[in-house]
A protein has these predicted regions:
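Soluble periplasmic/extracytoplasmic beta-strand elements of cell-envelope proteins
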Residues: 35-37, 83, 140-142, 151, ...
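Short beta-strand/loop motifs in extracellular/secreted proteins, especially
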Residues: 43-47, 148, 254
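A structural motif detector for short, solvent-exposed N-terminal "entry" segments of globular domains
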Residues: 126-169
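A mature extracytoplasmic/lumenal domain signature
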Residues: 40-42, 72-76, 82, 86-88, ...
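Solvent-exposed, polar/charged alpha-helical surfaces in well-ordered, non-transmembrane soluble domains
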Residues: 32, 36, 83-84, 148, ...
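Exported/periplasmic cell-wall-interacting domains
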Residues: 64-66, 134-136, 171-177, 184-259
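Hydrophobic residues in beta-strands and at strand termini
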Residues: 38, 72, 108, 164-166, ...
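Acidic, low-complexity Ser/Thr/Gly/Pro-rich repeat segments typical of extracellular/periplasmic
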Residues: 1-125, 130
Length: 259
């Protein structure tokens, strides 16, 4: 026969949580929220989610109430261990003490260093770890003048990072939001009498762009030892290999943010 109406629902069970327990270098954002998945629908229950240190969270759930995506209302503190607890109360028992059914922890990503490392390999590794995407959709090129690092992103995810050389003080690379206007595998600069391989203009007048280390007609190429410090006349230089990689990846209209 049918079960008695008073028969209680089995307690909800957490199937999975992202970020997983004990994960480090976590960056919670709208594209990477906290996700709690239950074994079955939790419609018959009140579910409580809590972070410690305390942080107010907003959430949305799927129609079946088996998956909840949580976002803190304000960004979580950098380099901090957070505990996530999930608890429930039965319907009609809103005043009851919540029963805890899950606890896990994660560590947020540390703040970016104030001073960038002189070792360019270390600096690149730091940039890959600490550069936050400023645009969440499509392709975009991030150029950090302070670190002399270019980071390329697609749909909010890091694709690669490269050491660059931007404009000398007084001949600074302009800051702001731009887009790739035109491109050519090899461009001749009448002004400086040299070739600029893998040219990608970022300003409509074509005065500023991204290109490989320049070379003279006789074949002499600017050395890679200048990468990592601002030595150009305003353009953004990439090393051999890196320039071809960015050129092959980017499109006309790809956005560029210089900061």
């Amino acid at each position: 026969g049918r079960p008695a109406l008073s028969e209680p629902n089995p307690a909800p069970r957490v199937l999975s949580v992202s970020p997983a327990d004990q994960i480090e270098d976590v960056l919670i954002g709208i594209e990477d929220p906290i996700v709690v998945t239950f074994e079955s629908s939790v419609k018959p229950f009140f579910i409580d989610f809590a972070l410690d240190p305390p942080a107010e969270v907003i959430y949305e759930n799927n129609p079946e109430k088996t998956e909840f995506r949580l976002l803190p209302k304000t960004p979580l503190r950098d380099g901090t261990a957070y505990a996530l607890t999930v608890a429930y109360r039965s319907e009609g028992q809103a005043d009851a003490t919540p029963i805890q059914i899950h606890q896990s922890s994660f560590q947020t990503l540390a703040a970016a260093p104030d001073a960038w490392n002189a070792d360019l390999d270390v600096r690149l590794a730091e940039a890959r770890k600490f550069t936050r995407p400023l645009i969440g959709q499509g392709k975009y090129i991030d150029i950090n003048l302070k670190s002399q690092v270019m980071t390329i992103f697609e749909d909010g995810h890091l694709v690669d990072a490269f050491i660059v050389s931007s404009g000398l003080p007084g001949m600074d690379t302009p800051q702001g939001e731009f887009a790739i206007q035109n491109r050519a595998e090899r461009v001749w600069s009448k002004r400086y009498s040299l070739y600029m391989p893998y040219w990608m203009a970022i300003t409509p007048d074509g005065k500023y762009g991204i290109h490989e280390l320049p070379e003279w007609p006789g074949g002499y190429k600017e050395g890679a030892n200048h990468l990592g410090r601002p030595v150009s006349h305003g353009c953004v230089r990439l090393g051999v290999g890196a320039a071809a990689r960015v050129y092959g990846w980017a499109d006309i209209g790809t956005r560029v943010i210089v900061h």
